[in-house]
Amino acid sequence: MVRRSLYFLAVMGVVRSSSGLYIPSVVLQELGIASSQGCLMIAETNNGNFGIVSSGLENPVYITESPQGHREVSWQPVRGEDRAVPIYAPSAEEVRESISSVRGSEPGQYIAPQPTGFVPASTPVFGTIESASTAGAAVPVEGVFVASTENPASTGSSSTSTCPPKGTAGTTDNKGKAGGAAADDKSKSSSSSSSKKKKKGAKSLVALGAVATTALFSIVM
């Protein structure tokens, strides 16, 4: 089976001891010119240079798999004594095995990026929650908390209470509730009045800006 493709561009590169492997623009231009002339290959000429040549439709290049199961390929040269390497697209397994490790000393398998290293912000995180014991000392209690600013969840019945202590008499407790409600009403009324004042001030600024713009246009005209 002949596998001809332009994906395996590394075969068309030029190897130099100083600069390594690269693909010059001349090679790409020759590839575009010869692509309509049958099977393409890299051929070594008599002077030792490599170039893109076309084998022609009458002399195709055959690529056969090794009977031992190896992924190495063999080909039939079509340029006499010149050596020719056919251009073909490697399989996914060949690409994986050709990629070396980070150090470059041992061959490694290609591993696609995995989403396991990314943790969303809403994912519960296991940690230690400190709770107050009966003696007043902080005792670590295992629990679950969510890294969020809204509605933090906590578990355990021995969590520290933030409510004010209850009074000894029922009248005192009722007075405290009434005082708290009155304070809440006052704070709500003050916040609403301040927001109304801010809105009125913004409207007056907008009106003043409109008047100034109209006056400026009338002066210019």
Curated annotation (Swiss-Prot):
Bilayer disposition of the protein: Lipid-anchor; GPI-anchor
Q: Does the record carry rRNA processing as a key word?
A: no
According to the Swiss-Prot or TrEMBL entry, at which residues is a lipid covalently attached (GPI-anchor amidated serine)? Answer: S192
Q: Composition bias, kind Low complexity: at what positions?
A: 154-173
Keyword annotations for this protein, in alphabetical order, are: Cytoplasm, Glycoprotein, GPI-anchor, Lipoprotein, Membrane, Signal
Q: Where is the signal peptide?
A: 1-20
Cell compartment(s), UniProt: Spore wall; Membrane; Cytoplasm
- The propeptide segment or segments lie at 193-221
Protein's job: Spore wall component.
Indicate whether Kinase appears among the record's keywords: no
Q: Where is the region Disordered?
A: 150-203
State the taxonomy lineage.
Eukaryota, Fungi, Fungi incertae sedis, Microsporidia, Unikaryonidae
Q: What is this protein called?
A: Spore wall protein 3
Q: Which GO terms describe its cellular component?
A: cytoplasm; side of membrane; spore wall
